[in-house]
Amino acid sequence: MCKLDSSYDFDAHMTVYVASDMPEPNEAAYLAALQRLLVDVHRAQNGSMLTLFTNRREMERCFDEVQPQLKVDDLRVVCQKWGVSVKGLRDDFLADEHLSLFALKSFWEGFDAPGATLKGVVIPKLPFAKPTDPLSCERAARDDQAWRRYVLPAAVLETKQAAGRLIRKADDTGVLILADRRLLTKSYGKAFLNSLPSRTIKVMTAAEIVSDLERSNNG
């Protein structure tokens, strides 16, 4: 169970952005659009971002495209590739205030980076369990409502936990960027948005999100 400190003023300290014009994750144009968004968001925030992926191949493809572009701006990003120490990544992230990280499951919960070390979390895709996951298959075989009973609530909770990475003490601030348009096009989208600790939710195009971040950081 994800328990967030209710004494924090999440509405004032956490802004949630939902990208309204992203292609859906199963569309061919999605990955290129995500890569553009990641480059622009990291530049607007001057680093200190945590991007939480659900798929290693997608993460590595994004990293290979995004990292060289950010390097031009002296923005460093690292990736949770095969064989890389999770502890080492955590330590590096905490030690370098401007470092950004592309990560997988082990960073969705239980990772604390208070203060300016973490200025934003990006969730490219809602963390639904794969239909081929053995537990999902077993539940689906004996319950035709298994997706709504188990898969959806688990994904909602995991997203809430990821949002909780941002505000770890009373004076923390940050942005949560949700790049999965299914939050707006599918009936279950409200379950995700209603679970978030902040009610400051802005539905904008990717370009508008970047402009809003730039205004906030330059104002």
What are these model-predicted stretches?
Residues M1-G219:
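ASCE RecA-like P-loop NTPase motor cores
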